[in-house]
């Protein structure tokens, strides 16, 4: 993980008028410029199929950018500087002749970053056309998820890109890896002997990873109904978080050292055969309910819905890792849409002390928890046992938190968005926050066996009302092991 070096490049953004680019990528680039983290010679080429005057499209971009950037962070001077970097080029990404104009617009002296904010089905065609235009040799390509919908299709996508680009110049995005708290997992684990010496099956009882979304499918029906929550969230985000929690110490902080250790975790994931799905996995689909006191439709009532869809909008599962460090330690993963709140957190539950000396009725209190909040209010909290204060309390125990809120502790005016970090790293040529080909494929291989089991059983997802924490069966999933999900849910 090298220090930040601000190096120049040309950033070609394919799909520049799409939702991702307008909602996330351009605001992130604006913020980097605001923080003086874009080199003065860096240029941004906005590429899309839409014809018309470039000035009109750039005016639309400015309007969307003003909506996306908080008013207190908008600076007309920064915008003018950013605007001077921008050019718009209308092109058909699959037409080789369109790349003549791109070739003329690119600075021959600078590296080219080609960001594919497009469907994966056109990745290969874009790569082929970049190569035919003589641009491949100095280009880094950035691939947005989803990379395929199963192992076979992900291999097809990866192989199509690999025909023209080596792995060292392929950057696969998982935006969770750009979150400040996720990056802090590396420092937390490997810079503090307090934790790393306890980070194993001798001291940890179990681990929870929750990624809850308050929204529904938000107009993504066409994509989501073909994917479902397992493909959309577990295959990438949750398994990446699991890897960072479970991996062994890397030999150094280079990209491949970190990714080698993550792959070892993915290889060690215990398969879940079809006959164990009922006891180890819960699928759910939200029905009509309430969010913030307002009535919201069920999944099958959403606009353009297929009324017979059995796509899951919720998944909870118990994952076991077959290695010495984690043998006997279950990892409980949970993710869903239309939850009561937007929440991403990891909870490490430590074991009780080996000998119990306090009052029996207090035994349920005697365990430490490390709570890693990814959103909202990014930070870390360690729950420890202390004596309750007061002369008449005796040796009455209570739980007390040791808090580390990033925004408060470091007096940060704002916590950078994940895409800001990821765009910065790719412009500097750093791969440590990006996903390697074998990570993608081992994650798909593990998820594919779950999907095959579901298809074999042909069971419908369990209903849960919007605004709840999922099907009742997800409570039973952990209760079966004598546990409960952390928090006042």
UniProtKB/Swiss-Prot annotation:
Pathway(s) per entry: Carbohydrate degradation; pentose phosphate pathway; D-ribulose 5-phosphate from D-glucose 6-phosphate (oxidative stage): step 1/3
Phenotypic consequence of gene deletion: Mutant is unable to grow on minimal medium supplemented with mannitol and shows increased sensitivity to the redox-active superoxide-generating agent methyl viologen (paraquat).
The entry's keywords: Carbohydrate metabolism, Glucose metabolism, NAD, NADP, Oxidoreductase
The keyword Oxidoreductase is annotated on this UniProt entry: yes
Factors inducing expression: Transcription is maximal during early logarithmic phase when inducing substrates such as glycerol, glucose or gluconate are abundant. Transcription decreases during stationary phase.
Gene3D superfamilies named among the record's database cross-references: Dihydrodipicolinate Reductase, domain 2, NAD(P)-binding Rossmann-like Domain
Record's signal peptide: none
Active site positions: 237 (proton acceptor)
Disulfide-bond pairs as recorded: none
One annotated Gene Ontology cellular component of this protein: cytosol
Binding site for substrate: 175, 179, 213, 232, 337, 342
GO BP, one annotated term: pentose-phosphate shunt, oxidative branch
Single Gene Ontology MF annotation: glucose-6-phosphate dehydrogenase activity
Record flagged with keyword Transcription regulation: no
EC number(s) stated in the UniProt entry for this protein: 1.1.1.363
Substrates-to-products reaction catalysed: D-glucose 6-phosphate + NAD(+) = 6-phospho-D-glucono-1,5-lactone + NADH + H(+); D-glucose 6-phosphate + NADP(+) = 6-phospho-D-glucono-1,5-lactone + NADPH + H(+)
Record family assignment: Belongs to the glucose-6-phosphate dehydrogenase family.
Subunit structure as annotated in this protein's UniProt entry: Homotetramer.
Protein name: Glucose-6-phosphate 1-dehydrogenase
Taxonomic source organism: Pseudomonas aeruginosa (strain ATCC 15692 / DSM 22644 / CIP 104116 / JCM 14847 / LMG 12228 / 1C / PRS 101 / PAO1)
